């Protein structure tokens, strides 16, 4: 065919001729035809956006970080995409999820203290415009599957009222993987109530007892993918229950890890493997149904691993609930055929609050309807390797911090500042806070458990404590050179300390009051048998 076409071309210049009647309209019609699914992916329509959020996955809980827990699907995706090696989340569930969906620091939403507990009349402020709302405005179909944990005391707080077309999952922070029940103490009633926490849309879903949640969520996610028309932009937020406690997993996932003698770590490893398999099933569905070539796939944890429940962040210091690197250094990567660079490790500073402006820009939407954002559009940083627009990161300021899982022998009370150094006048260093600027990080107050936790083994299952005195309230580190936070540089760089304290004071001055209301006994699910809105 090609040769015959070439032979038919005129050998010399031919005179210009007017287009034959009807040819011009035909060309116009051809130009206006919609492109075939998969053709010119990304050039003519916004990409599909799939965000998978793991729960309590630690730095040392994936094999691409050297763990003996096998994560082949995550490894393959990270190796073929962009591994985020200087990526941060918050140290707890609600704060990370709120910053993901608002693009704003906790100090600007009132959620800077702990999490939203089952009976608290609280949720992400209703005047905040969330990521799914912005994507809907940009023409996306929006689905959420899994853990919400952003408040549910009134119906206006529910996912389906905050921008998601569909929702399937649970509203609180944790529950049984099989019964899907959550037990919680209602203080004012002096009773512990156990009730179902599972929803399909806004309706209680009762037909899933004895079904493992990760499998159910994966099935729903893949069903949404397979029924989705490729020409319509999709946003799928899959917030897995894995690998948050309780430590539960089908028996067959335990057998490959019989060599792990620590019981918590043994179960946890099986849970990670099942989660890895789930991610593989989701990406397989995207590929088999023609969506992958125009998909940006993001994987992230919500905080560091909880060493009390099998997680591990070695060699990083600390764990979930803490502002040490082990509590906030995120496991994350981006995989997509649309990336301009692939198979690279990105060392630029990126935070979970950056996803909102990044994804809205990719969606060709607008953030004009939001309150002032703390996040940055980092797509060029990820896709092309450009310098990150983020130079500074406020990890948090919590004036009411109490560590509910302190190191052995540590006090629950925050540390008291015993220093008279003039630079300390810039900020009250007894406050639980941390900030990052460039390669510098400063922690103040009591940051949470500051031990190092080696992976459990037959020879070593104990934490390595720090030698810091209990009155210490200030720690500056060069994180690029010292990611394990072992070398306090306060004596060597007092001017850096002073500058970072001034920045903390700036943020503290511009923060809103902490919103952490007392329990409301009307939350009691005794009458309905299910947790849900009560106002």
From Swiss-Prot:
It catalyses: Hydrolysis of the 4-sulfate groups of the N-acetyl-D-galactosamine 4-sulfate units of chondroitin sulfate and dermatan sulfate. Substrate binds at residues 147, 244, 320. It is found in: Lysosome; Cell surface. GO terms for cellular component: cell surface; lysosome. Removes sulfate groups from chondroitin-4-sulfate (C4S) and regulates its degradation. Involved in the regulation of cell adhesion, cell migration and invasion in colonic epithelium. In the central nervous system, is a regulator of neurite outgrowth and neuronal plasticity, acting through the control of sulfate glycosaminoglycans and neurocan levels. PROSITE patterns: SULFATASE_1, SULFATASE_2. This is Arylsulfatase B. Homodimer. Belongs to the sulfatase family. The conversion to 3-oxoalanine (also known as C-formylglycine, FGly), of a serine or cysteine residue in prokaryotes and of a cysteine residue in eukaryotes, is critical for catalytic activity. Its cofactor is Ca(2+). CDD domains: 4-S. Disulfide bonds join 119-523, 123-157, 183-194, 407-449. It comes from Felis catus. The gene is ARSB.
